[in-house]
A protein has these predicted regions:
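N-terminal intrinsically disordered/low-complexity leader segments
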Residues: 1-7
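Helix-turn-helix
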Residues: 14, 18, 22-56, 60
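Solvent-exposed, amphipathic alpha-helical segments
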Residues: 14, 18-26, 72-76, 98, ...
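Hydrophobic alpha-helical connector segments
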Residues: 60, 71-105, 125-127
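Anionic, Ser/Thr-rich low-complexity intrinsically disordered regions
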Residues: 104-111, 115, 122, 148-157
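Glycine- and acidic-residue-rich phosphate-binding/metal-coordinating active-site segment common to enzymes
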Residues: 111-136
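C-terminal peripheral helix-coil segments that are non-catalytic and often amphipathic
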Residues: 131-140, 162-185
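A conserved mid-domain beta-alpha-beta active-site/ligand-binding segment of alpha/beta enzyme cores
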Residues: 143-148, 157-159, 173
Length: 185
């Protein structure tokens, strides 16, 4: 990842904001760097100066969204419970509902799990969270074990996000099955 200088910071923020807006409106694949530059009120050269590629923009957005999802879950449960396992269940449930609510959000989740850079961000951040949440219940597991389990649960999450709810796989079943097949047996 390139060094982020103070002079690059305002441009990066504008570009990230523009990209997020376009990705949610048109989808990742239908949002070009040229469109992002126009929305950010800059040129494509500036986008290339701030980010090496569109996937790098995606990685930054994934990091931001990931942190915000966990922040939101913390706020939802604040004063209700300190149960970290319930925290995991609620966070996963939020992901499923958010993807079901909007096709561009579904695509963003799918794209994020598909590209190696953004998937790595998810795997690493989620491994930290899983270890933080489940270490007391699974003290024999090392970081690598949580990482392996995250790759498995990410595969399940990606597939559940990719397939919209239907008459055979409605949201309640999707949530229950995800929890049942990951850490919440």
């Amino acid at each position: 990842m390139p060094v982020i200088t103070a002079e690059k910071q305002p441009a990066r923020k504008r570009i990230l904001h523009a990209a997020a807006k376009l990705f949610l409106k048109h989808g990742y694949y239908n949002s070009s760097l040229k469109m992002i530059a126009k929305e950010a009120n800059t040129n494509t050269g500036s986008v290339g100066w701030a980010f090496k590629a569109k996937e790098e923009i995606l990685c930054e957005l994934v990091t931001y969204v990931f942190d915000k999802q966990f922040e939101t879950t913390e706020k939802l449960l604040e004063g209700i419970t300190d149960d970290r396992v319930l925290f995991f269940a609620v966070e996963a449930t939020l992901q499923l509902y958010m993807a079901e609510a909007n096709e561009q959000v579904r695509e963003m989740y799918n794209v994020s799990y598909s590209f190696s850079g953004s998937a790595k961000v998810i795997y690493n951040k989620m491994t930290e969270k899983l270890q933080e949440i489940f270490k007391e219940y699974l003290p024999q597991l090392k970081t690598k074990d949580f990482y392996e389990r995250e790759i498995a649960s990410a595969g399940i999450m990606r597939n559940f996000i990719t397939v919209p709810c239907d008459m055979y796989f409605e949201m309640g079943r999707k949530i229950h099955t995800f929890h049942e097949t990951t850490f919440l047996e």
